[in-house]
Amino acid sequence: MSWQTYVDDHLMCDIEGHEGHRLTLAAIVGHDGSVWAQSATSPQFKPEEMNGIMTDFNEPGHLAPTGLHLGGTKYMVIQGEAGAVIRGKKGSGGITIKKTGQALVCGIYEEPVTPGQCNMVVERLGDYLLEQGL
């Protein structure tokens, strides 16, 4: 299965039980910041943004004072899972990033999608990739 198929079929899909509700943007990115696959409307990811995210996975709390920046958008960092998941909030939307052995699975949402729904979609794929050794 191609990385693009994971984005299209597992991240940009309808939320379970909520037809028509889906993430706004999604991407799978290598730990080095290289984009493996992304939704059609994903922004350009800057190297300094990816460096900050990877630093936060290695040093939880690193992004809390400055916020999480991705694609030029700033998110307030909210409780995640140290070393495994970073979550952010901006207005009525937000972001979830799940770290796997080789990649970062990113999902961005806006209402009516809820933070919990975004977490479920992103973390489910991330957990699957971890189980596959990826």
Swiss-Prot record:
InterPro entries: PFN (IPR048278), PFN_euk (IPR005455), PFN_sf (IPR036140), Profilin_CS (IPR027310). Its main location: cytoplasm. GO terms for molecular function: actin monomer binding. The modification Phosphothreonine is found at T114. Keywords: Actin-binding, Allergen, Cytoplasm, Cytoskeleton, Disulfide bond, Phosphoprotein. Disulfide bonds join C13-C118. CDD domains: PROF. Pfam families: Profilin. Phosphorylated by MAP kinases. A motif (Involved in PIP2 interaction) lies at residues 84-100. It is found in: Cytoplasm, Cytoskeleton. Occurs in many kinds of cells as a complex with monomeric actin in a 1:1 ratio. The variability of the residues taking part of IgE-binding epitopes might be responsible of the difference in cross-reactivity among olive pollen cultivars, and between distantly related pollen species, leading to a variable range of allergy reactions among atopic patients. Belongs to the profilin family. Binds to actin and affects the structure of the cytoskeleton. At high concentrations, profilin prevents the polymerization of actin, whereas it enhances it at low concentrations. This is Profilin-3. It comes from Olea europaea.
